[in-house]
């Protein structure tokens, strides 16, 4: 486990929303309230977070892809950074409708982005002022909208979503396609439809950073375990090889 209860407390994971905004479906995960703010029961959060990271670790070990989604201001930078560290795709600016359900069209845009990036690398982009300006605007827009998924050649195997209420469209698309969702769920949202619920504060920058770091660590560990198994299997196969010399 790469996190502790103390870290969660320091990050404010246990602070929910004002009691008047609560979603009754989150009742099983609420400890109580203080100053009209719901307090999330971290004794429930810890095992659920462990279950979510175990799933992510196993999926990464099978070369699965987990798409990180966090477009809220306090989540953008850390989501992009931790997803990149784990070698996973991410959406940090805005979710484009149809990003999953209309992935065929998205793949066309990804192909165009790569072609334009190749032009920049080769120095063959338009040189005429007006055309150059249009080229720069288009590539900047594509990089902003889909830059985080430019290496995602197929639909992801799972979504990791910070703030399920803020990303309802992304979750709806995933559910429609049968893609599992790991989601941070605060007291003002519903955990229904989320395959791996992480009850916790989705507004605190420290809490968001903790979720993203722990998830990235789990993925990296899963990849490393998979690689070690391959190396050990190869070593075992070489040990079994016995050279037989020809009789004199």
UniProtKB/Swiss-Prot annotation:
GO annotation, cellular component aspect: cytosolic small ribosomal subunit
Family matches, as InterPro entries: Ribosomal_uS2 (IPR001865), Ribosomal_uS2_bac/mit/plastid (IPR005706), Ribosomal_uS2_CS (IPR018130), Ribosomal_uS2_flav_dom_sf (IPR023591)
S-S bridge residues: none
Domain of life: Bacteria
PROSITE patterns: RIBOSOMAL_S2_1
Matches recorded under Pfam families: Ribosomal_S2
Protein name per the record: Small ribosomal subunit protein uS2
Protein species of origin: Leptothrix cholodnii (strain ATCC 51168 / LMG 8142 / SP-6)
